[in-house]
Amino acid sequence: MTNPHFAWLPPEINSALMFAGPGAGPLLAAAAAWGGLAEELASAVSSFSSVTSELTSGSWLGPSAAAMMAVATQYMAWLGAAAAQAEQAAAQAAVTAGAFESALAATVQPAVVTANRGLMQVLAATNWLGFNTPAIMDIEAAYEQMWALDVAAMAAYHAEASAAASALAPWKQVLRNLGIDIGKNGQINLGFGNSGTGNVGNNNVGNNNWGSGNTGSSNVGTGNTGSSNIGSGNTGNSNVGLGNLGSGNVGFGNTGNGDFGFGLTGDHQFGFGGFNSGSGNVGIGNSGTGNVGFFNSGNGNMGIGNSGSLNSGLGNSGSMSTGFGTASMSSGMWQSMHGSDMASSTSLASSATYATGGTATLSSGILSSALAHTGGLNPALAGGLTPTAATPAAAAPAAAAPVAAAAADAGPVSAGANSGSTAGAGLRSPAAGYSGLYNSANSDAGARSVATREAPANAGAGIPRSSFYPNRETADSEADIQLPLRTE
């Protein structure tokens, strides 16, 4: 280190760091371990040399024996170099331990530094009229001396430890000098067949790969191609899983970018592949873009069975519909729009132009009708209670059945003035032709068609007559009201 950090650290920190560690014990243990390894390697060299010499000098002769002996000689040379390296490591570890012990002895005790600082605080707190100034100066001088002693001890320790470490030969250099190649081309690779730097495993090409057969950088797994992949068989960058093709995929067998799931095709998909088609869909059976739910087609739909754009609900078609079975820009249930002027209606079970039955256009409510449309329960806009001024006359049987109050047009579409097949009348109509409920017409009768009261003997037509009042004819209608006649 050019400028060790301990040079500007106070003695409180340097002393505490030196005395807080385990001391020279680990270094001495390492030196002993390296020494033991050196002895074992030297013994292995001696034993292997003896065995190979016996083989090549007696029972094993010929070219194969010579080839084996050449390789064995290299191996014995490596064992000898390793033994020497281990012995040197043991010696340097012992030197480093000695340097630490020397530095520790030269370092000021932490308790002494703490006492100095405590006394300084007391003197400064009781320095009335400057009486403690000389003592404070002495305490500060002693503190500065402690600082210098700690820095000197650490500097000496740093120099000796650096010299001991620089004397060690790297193990990679020892193996390279011996001519032994075990497939580690590059630097700091661990394994076989690696090419690059920082690879751990086998047959990796690139840098910082963990696993086998990776091509690229920072891959973890097997057979990845690209960078920062985690898993197996990924092609691209930043994939997590198996067999992904693209970048940023999480799962298995995804093709695209940013997919999360299994077997997805496209970008930013979520779910299981084969169920959705398009981009940005979430759910099952969606086609298009940005759909959420099931069996939607189009763009931006949310729900089930929607078609179009920006719909939410069930079975909507068109754009921006909300509810169940609605059309464009509608909300509610079972709406349909066939004209540009029919948008934005809200009802329950309403229909569009030329609708017949229980509903009609531009109506809100339940089972209503309007605009010259007739329904199953209500007649048209100019309906039952308003008579028609120009009702055409039509012949009808004299004994026709009475027309009920709910009689309506027979055709699917009625005119604006209440016209049907023959223009039926309203609830009560004085006109000729087909009559209403009470009609004094000359053609088909209503429920009671006679304009005057019937005689008791002529029951069955007109308005029934009571025998409670005296029998008066039409000419007597202007007479005064008389008391009823008593009959026995």
Curated annotation (Swiss-Prot):
**What organism does this protein naturally occur in?**
Mycobacterium marinum (strain ATCC BAA-535 / M)
Q: Major place of localization? A: secreted
Name of the protein in question: PPE family protein PPE10
Keywords (A to Z) from UniProt: Secreted
Q: What high-level taxonomic lineage is stated for the organism?
A: Bacteria, Bacillati, Actinomycetota, Actinomycetes, Mycobacteriales
Q: Which GO terms describe its biological process?
A: response to host immune response
One GO CC annotation: extracellular region
Gene name on record? PPE10
Q: What biological function has been recorded for the protein in this entry? A: Plays a major role in the integrity and stability of the capsule.
According to its UniProt record, where is this protein located?
Answer: Secreted
What effect does gene inactivation have here? Mutants have impaired capsule integrity as well as reduced surface hydrophobicity. Mutants have reduced amounts of surface localized proteins and glycolipids, and morphological differences in the capsular layer. Disruption of the gene is associated with reduced ubiquitin association in cell infection and attenuated virulence in the early stages of infection.
Q: Region (Disordered): which ranges? A: 207-232, 443-488
